[in-house]
């Protein structure tokens, strides 16, 4: 009985002490060879503060490594606002991690297939947009900021990335999906200094 009580207490303590960002998925493993990880649109952040590599991509999960050869994970690191347009279980595509002004930012494409925004040439277009989450640490948790919308709601956008121009203004560079304009354009939109929202309207680059 004492042994069972001790194990129960130990388990509770372990759960309490486990940081919020360390939410292991059911597929968590350690010492995973890089070529064993199946991941689309991978992006790796080499974090100088922790001397650790952080990898994410489509699917919204995260892996860690100290040598780029073997990894541990995946971790669940996103916390979305389920009351927003994203809903409860959005698809997450092409996620990226960026360090900027002592914060960490999660740029990704979120899709809510339950919301239809347009139909062009027989193609139903769901609510899809590039969006930004923030964290104090590279392994999350990444949470929403002030603005729930960075780009027009009726415009499907994807594959957003981060860019700072020569005047130190931050931007999101993204794609206006071809399904709507039947060609696809690469555009940019200025971000607020803390990246918590967008400023003005997007501009076509090409």
Feature map (PLM): residue ranges:
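Carbohydrate-active catalytic/glycan-binding domains of CAZyme proteins
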Residues: 20-206
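Bacterial Sec-dependent N-terminal signal peptides
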Residues: 1-24
